[in-house]
Swiss-Prot record:
This is Aspartate kinase-like protein lolA2. InterPro entries: ACT-like_dom_sf. The keyword NADP does not apply. Loline alkaloids show broad-spectrum anti-insect activity, and different lolines may have different biological activities. In vitro tests of NFL, NAL, NML, and semisynthetic loline derivatives with long carbon-chain acylations on the 1-amine have shown that many are effective against both fall armyworm larvae and European corn borer larvae, but the effects seem to differ depending on the modifications. N-Formylloline reduces the weight gain of fall armyworms by deterring feeding, and does not significantly affect corn borers. Aspartokinase-like protein; part of the gene cluster that mediates the biosynthesis of loline alkaloids, potent insecticidal agents composed of a pyrrolizidine ring system and an uncommon ether bridge linking carbons 2 and 7. Lolines are structurally differentiated by the various modifications of the L-amino group and include norloline, loline, N-methylloline, N-acetylloline, N-acetylnorloline, and N-formylloline. Keywords: Alkaloid metabolism. It comes from the Eukaryota. Residues 11-26 have a biased composition (Polar residues). One of its GO terms (cellular component) is cytosol.
């Protein structure tokens, strides 16, 4: 999913912080910022990837439209406009899609800049044309996907989300693959640098002692 993204390898970080299991949490001073890490235990991901220029589209049908019909129309729309979906989730009849801004701009047309004018009225009208009529639409622009790839572990998901919560990094979407080898989160694009630093320090550096 993130094959075009820059990757940070775990073996590129040296360990000089000692045993992480001695405390429930650890604070790291990095570039005049304090990063709080929950104790990871035996967690050692292989890499972190990030993909920017993501738009999150949240859709829900009107009451008169059955869920199965609404879902079919959404997928037909994606196929018609050949929109690549980076992440997808459903909940109580709602559909949330993470789409590349460039793909949206191509589908809507060159008259609207998906990167710089994402919340404009022109873009909203363009999205309304792409999608079925029987829906309520919300857009969340300027997002990014951060993906952690590693070994299967029942603890890695909890540690990732505890670390993000401790550092005030909010998530909009979460995806965990069936093999438990990777976790992807959609966050605000303005928090990508912070998230990379947090994950590198808390997941890589402290796991090298195990």
């Amino acid at each position: 999913m993130l094959d075009e993204s820059p990757m940070r390898k775990g073996n590129s970080v040296s360990n000089d912080q000692g045993n992480p299991e001695s405390n429930a949490s650890v604070s790291i001073h990095q570039q005049n910022q304090i990063i709080t890490c929950a104790s990871p235990g035996p967690v050692c991901p292989n890499a972190i990837g990030i993909k920017r220029d993501i738009v999150v589209v949240r859709l829900r049908p009107v009451k008169s439209c059955p869920d199965y019909r609404f879902f079919r129309r959404v997928f037909e729309t994606l196929e018609k406009w050949q929109l690549q979906v980076d992440m997808f989730s459903t909940s109580l009849g709602r559909i949330t899609l993470a789409l590349g801004a460039a793909a949206l701009q191509a589908g809507i047309g060159d008259s609207c800049s998906a990167r710089n004018d994402m919340m404009s009225r022109d873009l909203m009208h363009g999205m309304q044309k792409l999608l079925p009529d029987d829906h309520i639409l919300e857009l969340f622009p300027h997002m990014a996907i951060i993906s952690v790839v590693g070994h299967p572990s029942r603890r890695i998901a909890g540690h990732i989300f505890a670390t993000m919560d401790a550092n005030d990094i909010l998530t909009v979407m979460i995806s965990h693959d069936a093999a438990r080898l990777g976790i992807a989160c959609v966050i605000s694009e303005q928090h990508t640098a912070k998230a990379l630093g947090v994950f590198e320090q808390c997941l890589f550096r402290y796991s090298l002692t195990h």
